[in-house]
A protein has these predicted regions:
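Sequence contexts marking disulfide-bonded cysteines in secreted/extracellular proteins
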Residues: 7-9, 59-61, 112-114, 188-190, ...
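Active-site acidic/histidine clusters and adjacent loop/turn architecture
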Residues: 46-136
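Residue-level "edge-of-site" marker
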Residues: 77, 139, 226
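N-terminal secretory targeting signals
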Residues: 1-70
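Mid-length scaffold segments of soluble, non-membrane domains
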Residues: 109-136, 142-173
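Catalytic cores and adjacent binding grooves of peptidoglycan-active enzymes
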Residues: 16-18, 28-38, 72, 80-86, ...
């Protein structure tokens, strides 16, 4: 359903994605007109998400090394640049609720290198808010019956994370399910947006998310405002080869 809403194939090959990387002004306007939650800024090429989405595996890994991010290259079907991060990002750990021993080999801890760059930028925001841990449901979800050589998108391509809880250095937890306080169809960030009721936890959680939105770290940001299946997490995604942003 999301692919239809965005007007793109469920899993476009990287070559086709690159060809569509620079939509015309009219195409951008059509997308915005169809979905008010989509924006297509004229300076999209300069944004973090778009720049990261265009990186090759080697160039992306070189950037991880330049940032002193420890990682190992993984083998993951459908993923262009699969890695397993071995270090915290700006003092923030991103992990599932699996036991530490299980995380070491869990496919859900594999991420495309380009997502890791976006998460590293996001971690800088989290650090300012005193967040030291992000508990997520998954990044990579191994696809079934996947053709050899096909590059995936979203979770199939390890380009998305479903973040459910944010743990502070004081032990307090911002829980998306409990603290987001949104409504399906409501605006997530910007004028007129905000949690109802605006409890301190809800305000802090919304501030964290909307700082990431303002920084254009992810092409797709889906929240409990999008639909019921997203009631307990933020879906944060780098979408390769596009120059639009969906926030809902």
């Amino acid at each position: 359903a999301l692919a239809v809403a965005l007007g793109c194939a469920p899993s476009a090959h990287a070559g086709r994605a690159r060809a569509a990387a620079k939509p015309s002004t009219k195409a951008r306007a059509r997308r915005v007109a169809i979905n008010p939650h989509i924006t297509a800024p004229t300076d999209a090429a300069e944004t973090a998400a778009v720049r990261y989405g265009r990186l090759s595996q080697d160039d992306c890994e070189a950037e991880l090394n330049a940032r002193a991010i420890e990682f190992t290259r993984e083998d993951a079907r459908g993923v262009l640049a699969p890695v397993r991060v071995a270090s915290e990002l700006h003092g923030v750990s991103f992990h599932t609720d699996e036991k530490p021993a299980a995380r070491a080999t869990s496919p859900y801890q594999i991420a495309d290198c380009r997502l890791v760059l976006a998460l590293d930028d996001f971690a800088a925001i989290l650090e300012r808010h005193g967040i030291v841990e992000v508990r997520h449901y998954s990044m990579y979800r191994p696809p079934h019956g996947w053709p050899d050589g096909k590059i995936g998108s979203r979770h199939d391509g390890a380009l998305a994370i479903d973040a459910g809880r944010f743990v502070g250095d004081d032990g307090k937890v911002l829980d998306v399910d409990r603290d987001f306080h949104g409504a399906i169809g409501a605006r997530t960030c910007g004028d007129g947006a905000g949690p109802r009721p605006s409890t301190p936890a809800a305000v802090e959680l919304r501030a964290i998310l909307c700082e990431a939105v303002d920084a254009h770290l992810f092409n797709v940001v889906l929240t409990p405002n999008y639909n019921r299946p997203h009631k307990n997490h933020f879906h944060l995604e780098v979408t390769a080869g596009v120059s639009w942003f969906l926030v809902h």
